[in-house]
Amino acid sequence: MGKLHRGLAEFNGCASSIPPKYQTVIISNEEKKGFSSQSRRFEEYLNESPGPGSYLSHSPAEGCSPSFSKRGTGSFASKGGRVPRSFQRLSPGPDAYNLQMSLLHKHDFNRGESRIFRLPYALKKEKPNNENPAPNQYDVSYRAVDKNSTISGESAFRSKTRRSAVVSDKFKGPSPCHYKVSDVLVQKSPQALVSCFKSKTARIQSPVRNNIPGPGTYNPHQPPEPVKRTVLPRRYYLGLSAPPLIPEKVPPFPGPGHYDIVNYNRPVKHMVSSAAFLSGTNRHMQEVKGQDIPGPGFYEPTVLSKTSFLYNPAKLWIPA
């Protein structure tokens, strides 16, 4: 049901999918003797009081929390690692460079404090073989090297399209404040019932200006004005050319009495009984205008005895 560990070393085991109920840690106070001394130098006892850093407000970015099952815990928990703990970095670490002595920490307990073990001061400083900056002089970005620590389920058909659009120099058009968009293209017109045979004729037509006199302009009892004409002399006269003729003015518009007005005041027709399929054709023949128009049979077309190219409206020059 539980786990057993020995020693003070921190145990970083794999988190099982079904965690155990408790964990047993055995601490031994054994330590190695140094310099023939039997006194204990380090006394560390594990207690339940919170240590330094326990009350930090922020939590680590990568949390390792076991999953608790609804049916409880069991002794056959899986020990397979869900998230890999170690990441392989392709970039050189801090120990790959040769640091200067001045950059090392002065308070090093591995060195003696006596003057016997110190190096002499009058020494020629060695020039570094590589003048590149040290690891503590710049910040290395591991975004392109490290793998993603939060491994989650990924779809096989994951989109590879970038979310941040790269604006190129080709799209250098005017901004929205440089032009005005017509509301007709944006807003929708109210939908109403419209007939498919809707008339497009304007109901109110524009007034037409004409010089035709209106009603009441003429006076039928007033005699017409005499026409002015040039009277040529009847005798001979000396002149190099004919006398000038004054051009006639534009004839006036027709007045009342110029047209044959039809009398529409005919006797009223009385309704008589008739058949259901009475013909609506008028029996009275109207006066046909243009009596001088020749009727059928007026012409006598002559038949040509010989073929002539002059009478060839179809322009067919090949004999049939």
From Swiss-Prot:
Top-rank taxon, per record: Eukaryota
Any one GO molecular-function label of the UniProt entry: chromatin binding
Stretches for region Disordered: 46-91, 207-226
Annotated STPGR repeat ranges: 49-82, 91-103, 132-163, 173-192, 213-233, 254-266, 294-305
Keyword entries, A-Z: Apoptosis, Cytoplasm, Nucleus, Repeat
InterPro entries documented for this protein: SHIPPO-rpt
GO biological process, one term: apoptotic process
Gene Ontology CC entries for this record: cytoplasm; female pronucleus; germinal vesicle; male pronucleus
Record keyword Endoplasmic reticulum present: no
Major location (coarse): cytoplasm
Role played: May positively contribute to the induction of apoptosis triggered by O(6)-methylguanine.
Homology family: Belongs to the STPG1 family.
Record protein name field: O(6)-methylguanine-induced apoptosis 2
Originating organism: Danio rerio (Zebrafish)
